[in-house]
Amino acid sequence: MNENLFASFATPTMVGLPIVILIIMFPSILFPSPNRLINNRLISIQQWLVQLTSKQMMAIHNSKGQTWTLMLMSLILFIGSTNLLGLLPHSFTPTTQLSMNLGMAIPLWAGTVFMGFRHKTKAALAHFLPQGTPIFLIPMLVIIETISLFIQPVALAVRLTANITAGHLLMHLIGGATLALMSISPSTALITFIILILLTILEFAVAMIQAYVFTLLVSLYLHDNT
């Protein structure tokens, strides 16, 4: 119980060197390239899920937006597998680091905005000034719309960080309370343990939902700019 509550969010090191790069690369092992003519059940399920997600997410895009399919599918698989691996005991979740999430959100957001200004310049500039705006409100609305545009990647990264971090902290607190109550009140400890099991199941769902939400918002930003 004396362990620092945020110790599990510290970047792990080996021989004094951070190994976060190895941790980030680890999810790629979960999706191996098939080397046989007939896929096994696991690979077939993975391919079916990827195809289903890509159809739902990319249905709203035109031909220019469709070129982002591979990137968006890689993004949702990476975030989802990273979140799920972070639920394992004594593991590290890179998506609890705001710096990493910003590193994903800013380039993707910047790419969508760049495409908008390149292919739909007039429409992209029109977003800064809604139609029918009174003349005396034009300067204020331009500033507000500019701020709302630049805050999109920050909100994207903070949303993912906050949801994953909150779940891990809650599991840590309930797990610590369960251990402390085992010697004091076993019946109460059993109740908290059941709550912990239910929360863990919920966190598995949250891990996948947050990966989908992050990728879906990037997809919507792309749709607005293509």
UniProtKB/Swiss-Prot annotation:
A Gene Ontology cellular-component term: mitochondrial inner membrane
Lineage: Eukaryota, Metazoa, Chordata, Craniata, Vertebrata
Organism: Equus caballus
TM ranges: 12-32, 68-88, 97-117, 135-155, 164-184, 189-209
Name this polypeptide is given: ATP synthase F(0) complex subunit a
UniProt catalytic activity: H(+)(in) = H(+)(out)
Keywords assigned by UniProt, alphabetized: ATP synthesis, CF(0), Hydrogen ion transport, Ion transport, Membrane, Mitochondrion, Mitochondrion inner membrane, Transmembrane, Transmembrane helix, Transport
Subunit structure: Component of the ATP synthase complex composed at least of ATP5F1A/subunit alpha, ATP5F1B/subunit beta, ATP5MC1/subunit c (homooctomer), MT-ATP6/subunit a, MT-ATP8/subunit 8, ATP5ME/subunit e, ATP5MF/subunit f, ATP5MG/subunit g, ATP5MK/subunit k, ATP5MJ/subunit j, ATP5F1C/subunit gamma, ATP5F1D/subunit delta, ATP5F1E/subunit epsilon, ATP5PF/subunit F6, ATP5PB/subunit b, ATP5PD/subunit d, ATP5PO/subunit OSCP.
Gene Ontology MF terms: proton channel activity; proton-transporting ATP synthase activity, rotational mechanism
